[in-house]
């Protein structure tokens, strides 16, 4: 478990969480793996008077009684990366998709799940379960407390989606969410991104009403391409909150408020507007997949899904 992270086989770049991980390994304690709950893997142990049998299949003969307990949830979950791919059979999926490329759990299950996946995968396959792990924080209530049934402060995401749309909820959770840090859920923030979704829709309506005329204006193209490079770099370095916020400010404060206003009555802007819109949809798609896909489907000559289009920056 230590060697997998120390060697870099599992890249855990957040130093604070690396220290937490190693501290736990250096201070291991016994783990009771049996649980008295309704669902789970049955413990493969049978008893008959003073006899005890452990095996994959039930023992032969009469009078055997299987242990009534099940394995701890985290014991079973630790097998996830390979058990879902057909293990213990040597399947094509297991060969192709294991180890997983990237894992992003919350910090509260770093020991419960991440460390135990590394343990189980190493024991059973001699492999790491994933190549990189980035730890994220928790979504808390507006006052900073954990969501809790006893506090009755939970938020039903389906209600938020019904009220504001899935894209607005996604943006409300992404912007401001520094990786590894907790965020406070604020419904007003989600509401604000519903207004942004409306703005994106109106931007598209205006651009699609224009003819694709004129030459692409070099200055505006270079400005947008510079933004696209910044957004791409942010995403590659897991600063997704910064990437989303930059797109928000550009589309609303620059493209809609300035460039579109300047272009009104000027057909020579046509190709430039289409260039910016098309590539903005590509950049925004990971954050707001539904509205961007819908707009893309309305654009002339677009047959493939937006999600399989080439990224603007190679």
Regions found by a protein language model. Name each.
Residues 191, 300-314:
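C-terminal low-complexity, glycine/proline- and small-hydrophobic-enriched intrinsically disordered tails
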Residues 1-212, 220-264, 271-285:
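Structured secondary-structure scaffolds
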